[in-house]
């Protein structure tokens, strides 16, 4: 992936820049926008460029389609023999990035599961479509949400509600996420991006 100025188009995402607002869209709808290493590294480069661009003020991260924000790690890619590599700054270049100076808004347009939920939790604000839902299903398959879910969720909603989600893997709809405190606003799906831009 090269700087946007070099006009090379990203393969697994898109970037639309308007008035200092970067709209970054994960584009793997056939895999529920799950991220394999090439997509993760591409997003990490996009967010590095966003950080370095003095004209960039805020980024909005969303997923293509209405079904999924991001289903997390692309397990099928791993099952098919793909190497597991993660950018130094974590999933999408966000989950292990503690030096950000500009806000990133997650516009969650559908399911945000596992690493996808962890990416949303790493953003500064979460605006969710009414039909969006969230979960950390790792415990059900003997894994742990080590890309930030285990420490960000308890900090954002308190220990007991967070453990309830982490240990059971249960899914939480957008309106419950708002009540619990990790979602900032719930809006009708068609209004999601406009609301995030405001």
Where do the language-model regions lie?
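Short glycine-rich anion-binding loops that position phosphate/pyrophosphate groups of nucleotides
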Residues: 65-67, 110-111
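An acidic, glycine-rich surface segment that forms the CoA-thioester-binding/catalytic face
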Residues: 41-48, 52, 75-109, 113, ...
